[in-house]
UniProtKB/Swiss-Prot annotation:
Gene behind the chain: lpxB
Pathway, per record: Bacterial outer membrane biogenesis; LPS lipid A biosynthesis
Keyword DNA-binding found: no
Protein name: Lipid-A-disaccharide synthase
A Pfam family assignment: LpxB
Length: 375
């Protein structure tokens, strides 16, 4: 069996999780494999030779990207040339479409097979990107079923592999075990999840803490947990907590334990909303962007929803309070009844979980190797 060289690029923590799972599954099927590209600590632990820190790609929002555009373009140009020189058997771009789609196009033109893992939101906005995907991508791997249908209609080779989170999160999470592990007792608990990026926490952190203070007046005995993605986010939140008397426990990571332990979640739009759905926890989704970014997106976005639970259901399962709607009082008012009883909201969550539970990393590995079988 000849050595396989696989190039991968992931742009943020969720991509690092997907990439490491795919790498493990590829190694199980083809032990003589070398990994190069850009990834985080999980991918590096699986053997990735990372050319530069993944964090340099983790930028959110149109306005925020402009501040780093020169660096991003310079890194991308250098990376394309490095990969053309290395001639990997396949390039796999994991999410980060504004960075990776251009790489895929250039590498495919150079005769390298290309895969994109995690569909960009082309069905929601900037739909013309599908033309670039069709030209630059030998195979699209989607995590969600409605995405695969979209690509089939557009003539792009596609495979729905399911979502790795649906594989790893149990169909029924034990709330009491999670509470014991976190040292939490009985009584109502709300998880506050304002995001993992500095910009997100900057825009949503204090808002969520204000909402928590309002909620204390509406739900007697309520307590809060807030998982921090890293030490920098923890320091950011600790600064916001100064002068407040909230019954709140900060956690280092442990977002899954927080979701398992809680009764309801106040959460930023993003992958974490899918995690909350998979844990069958009722949620209120909130998001704020830089005003100019929001103004532009509002005019571009075709989808009526932003959160994954609503996109998967194709209807409003969970409330979304965005931009000016996301006031602390409105968040508390919407969340309070869900803390008391959110069962009506979560009725469809189990069905969605089972649809997404397909052994994603192995499905993705098989699809990649099938693409390479004639190399």
């Amino acid at each position: 069996m000849a050595q396989l060289c696989v190039a991968l690029v992931a742009g943020e923590a969720s991509g690092d999780i997907l990439g490491s799972g795919l790498m493990r599954a590829l190694k199980a099927r083809h032990p003589d494999v070398r990994f190069i590209g850009v990834g985080g600590p999980l991918m590096e632990a699986e053997g990735l030779q990372s050319y530069f820190p993944m964090e340099r790609l983790a930028v959110m929002g149109l306005v925020e990207v402009l501040g780093r555009l020169r660096e991003l373009l310079k890194r991308r140009k250098l990376l394309i040339q490095t990969l053309i020189d290395e001639k990997p058997d396949v390039f796999i771009g994991i999410d980060a479409p504004d960075f990776t789609l251009n790489i895929e196009l250039k590498l495919r033109q150079a005769g390298i097979k290309t895969v994109h893992y995690v569909s960009p939101s082309v069905w929601a906005w900037r739909q013309k990107r599908v033309l670039k995907i069709r030209e630059g991508c030998d195979l699209m791997l989607t995590l969600l079923p409605f995405e695969a249908r979209f690509y089939e209609e557009q003539g792009v080779p596609v495979r729905f592999v399911g979502h790795p989170l649906a594989d790893t999160i149990p169909l029924e999470a034990d709330r009491s075990v999670a509470r014991a592990a976190l040292g939490l007792g009985e009584g109502p608990i709300v998880a506050l999840m304002p995001g993992s990026r500095g910009g997100e926490v900057g825009r949503l952190g204090a808002l969520f803490l204000d909402a928590a203070e309002h909620l204390c007046q509406q739900v007697p005995g309520v307590r809060f947990v807030l998982p921090c993605a890293n030490a920098a986010r923890r320091a950011q939140v600790e600064h916001m907590l100064e002068g407040r008397q909230l019954p709140l426990t900060l956690l280092d990571g442990q977002s899954h334990q927080a979701l398992a332990a809680c009764d309801a979640v106040l959460i930023a739009s993003g992958t974490a909303t899918l995690e909350a759905l998979l844990y069958k926890r009722p949620m209120v989704v909130a998001y704020r962007l830089a005003p100019l970014t929001y103004w532009i997106l509002k005019r571009l976005v075709k989808s009526p929803y932003v959160s994954l639970p609503n996109l998967l259901a194709q209807r409003e399962l969970v409330p979304e309070l965005l931009q000016d709607q996301a006031t602390s009082q409105a968040l508390a008012n919407t969340l309070a009844p869900l803390v008391r009883d959110g069962s009506q909201q979560t009725e469809r969550f189990d069905e969605i979980h089972r649809t997404l539970r397909r052994d994603a990393s192995n499905q993705a590995a098989e699809a990649v190797l099938a693409l390479l079988k004639d190399r």
